[in-house]
């Protein structure tokens, strides 16, 4: 999708569609008012019929509006004026993105920057706008045969003009950021949506290597022998039941000064999670291909920051394997030794994400990081606690947690913090090892993070549990690309002088 920015008036644009915003009380912004004037009041009269619902994101297509050079005007409701803010704006953008993706117009002009969003500047507005439209155009068909029928003829907008009052360098940079983040989300979605027989640990490694070649990133891929030499007994215990060889991916983005400490991102890469010997129920087990969405988000974020050329150093660590039953698989009751030297009693083989992450978190120490953020579809308990709106956030540093929460608000990819109190550590006690890998039926998200916290004593660390936000089920089943927007916003802020 190609985005350009220009000044001008909407009624003179010869394009397939012109998008304008209106409020529930009929109040028109500058662009909508210009269309109304050119149509001699016809535009307002059509809106006055009540066909456009008041709810933010409602749409009304008006064809052949008098006085306008475009084929159709797409009016989007911004909701009630006194309730207008981030949520209403995003609701409108999501609706526009979907409409443009499925519409017949190949070229579109979007005239929405004339409506200020309270507390937000024009750069934020443009970045969000571009990201939403580009993300709305996403479709996954890598595992389908060639498109047939009418849907193949409706490929949506390929060219989008953003109409503004002025053009500045910062506005153009905001557009580029929006595109970069959308591309990172698309990569994360592609990887998440691929089935487990396509997206194996080796496939993730090959994707990282290809990304490295494209953007001149240093990428290392460690195999089973390398991991054994490092003493990654916890990670390797998960891989024992699978015929797919495990991989440990190390990525380096060096956009900052050589002396700058890196931010380390760690992504859980279970490319299919059967539960192992502690086998999951069969219902919806197909969705366990999404258990590598933490890894996908790291790869997507690396693509985004490389496209933006952020002045920051970032290391990406991706431990990746399948979790399968088999004659050689780890059994409940087995005790393994992690890279840190701490021993773990594996009480449930379906609590495997923490077992691969803990060795990656130990490996992260060698980079003397400014901070470490791990991303994982870790616990069903997080979905029970928070639903599918925010990601769960736990951290051993309150300032780091606040950064991530704030960046979640700015990006719209929100998180919610849960406690990481010492009292919960008692639930991980084991009679046969330094710790068990589960803490019982209560506070599952917290005890999982408490387990990881035992491997993060050397640095500031935060954990994002994306079990509820990495994908959606039902008719719209598929990966969401989250939390790439949150991570990208966090790294943008860090590159501009935030703590660290």
Curated annotation (Swiss-Prot):
- The gene name reads pepA
Chief location bin:
cytoplasm
> Which cysteines in this chain are paired by disulphide bridges?
none
Family statement drawn from the similarity comment of this UniProt entry: Belongs to the peptidase M17 family.
Cofactor details (free text): Binds 2 manganese ions per subunit.
Source species, please?
Answer: Aromatoleum aromaticum (strain DSM 19018 / LMG 30748 / EbN1) (Azoarcus sp. (strain EbN1))
Q: What does this protein do?
A: Presumably involved in the processing and regular turnover of intracellular proteins. Catalyzes the removal of unsubstituted N-terminal amino acids from various peptides.
What subcellular locations does the record give? Cytoplasm
Q: Show the GO MF annotations.
A: manganese ion binding; metalloaminopeptidase activity
For this protein, the record's PROSITE patterns field holds: CYTOSOL_AP (PS00631)
The alphabetized list of GO BP terms reads: proteolysis
Database matches in SUPFAM superfamilies:
Macro domain-like, Zn-dependent exopeptidases
**Where does the chain bind Mn(2+) 2?**
268, 273, 291, 352
Q: Which PANTHER family match?
A: CYTOSOL AMINOPEPTIDASE (PTHR11963:SF23), LEUCINE AMINOPEPTIDASE-RELATED (PTHR11963)
Which residues are recorded as binding Mn(2+) 1?
273, 350, 352
Keyword Transmembrane helix, does the record have it?
no
Which NCBIfam families is this protein grouped with? PRK00913.1-2, PRK00913.1-4, PRK00913.2-4
Q: Name one GO cellular component term.
A: cytoplasm
Q: Which cofactor does it need?
A: Mn(2+)
One family name in Pfam for this protein: Peptidase_M17
EC number(s) recorded for this UniProt protein: 3.4.11.1, 3.4.11.10
Catalytic site positions: 280, 354
Q: What is this protein called?
A: Probable cytosol aminopeptidase
Q: Which CDD domains match?
A: Peptidase_M17
């Amino acid at each position: 999708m190609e985005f350009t920015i220009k000044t001008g008036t909407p009624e003179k644009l010869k394009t397939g569609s012109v998008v304008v915003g209106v409020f529930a009380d009929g109040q028109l912004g500058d662009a909508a008012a210009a269309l109304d004037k050119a149509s001699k009041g016809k535009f307002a009269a059509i809106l006055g019929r009540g066909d456009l619902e008041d709810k933010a994101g409602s749409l009304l297509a008006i064809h052949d509006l008098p006085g306008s050079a475009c084929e159709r005007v797409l009016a989007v409701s911004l909701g009630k004026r006194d309730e207008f803010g981030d949520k209403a704006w995003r609701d409108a953008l999501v609706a526009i993105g979907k409409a443009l993706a499925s519409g017949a117009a190949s070229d579109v002009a979007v005239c929405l920057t004339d409506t200020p969003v309270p507390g937000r500047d024009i750069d934020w507005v443009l970045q969000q706008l571009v990201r939403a439209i580009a993300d709305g155009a996403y479709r996954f068909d890598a595992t389908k045969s060639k498109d047939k029928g009418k849907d193949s003829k409706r490929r949506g907008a390929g060219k989008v003009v953003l109409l503004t009052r002025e053009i500045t360098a910062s506005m153009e940079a905001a557009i580029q950021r929006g595109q970069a983040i959308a591309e990172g989300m698309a990569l994360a979605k592609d990887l998440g949506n691929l089935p487990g027989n396509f997206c194996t640990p080796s496939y993730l490694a090959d994707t990282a290597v290809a990304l490295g070649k494209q953007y001149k990133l240093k990428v290392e891929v460690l195999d089973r022998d390398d991991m054994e030499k490092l003493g990654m007994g916890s990670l390797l215990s998960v891989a024992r039941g699978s015929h797919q060889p495990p991989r440990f991916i190390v990525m380096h983005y060096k956009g900052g000064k050589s002396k700058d400490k890196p931010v380390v991102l760690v992504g859980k890469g279970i490319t299919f999670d059967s539960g192992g010997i502690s086998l999951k129920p069969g219902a919806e087990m197909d969705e366990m291909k999404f258990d590598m969405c933490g890894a996908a988000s790291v790869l997507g974020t690396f693509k985004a920051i490389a496209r933006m050329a952020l002045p920051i150093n970032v290391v990406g660590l991706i431990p990746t394997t399948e979790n399968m039953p088999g004659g050689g698989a780890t059994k409940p009751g087995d005790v393994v030794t992690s890279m840190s030297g701490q021993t773990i009693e594996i009480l449930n083989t379906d609590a495997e994400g923490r077992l691969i992450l803990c060795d990656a978190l130990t490996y992260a120490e060698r980079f003397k990081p400014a901070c470490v953020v791990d991303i994982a579809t870790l616990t069903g308990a997080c979905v029970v606690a928070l639903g599918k709106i925010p990601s769960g956030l736990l951290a051993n540093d309150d300032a780091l947690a606040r950064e991530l929460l704030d960046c979640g608000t700015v990006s719209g990819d929100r998180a919610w913090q849960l406690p990481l109190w010492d009292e919960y550590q008692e639930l991980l006690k084991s009679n046969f090892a330094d710790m068990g890998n589960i803490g019982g039926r209560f506070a599952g998200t917290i005890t999982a993070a408490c387990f990881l916290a035992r491997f993060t004593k050397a640095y500031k660390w935060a954990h994002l549990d994306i079990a509820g936000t990495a994908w959606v089920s039902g008719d719209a089943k598929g990966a969401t690309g989250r939390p790439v927007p949150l991570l990208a916003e966090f790294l943008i802020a860090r590159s501009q002088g935030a703590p660290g």
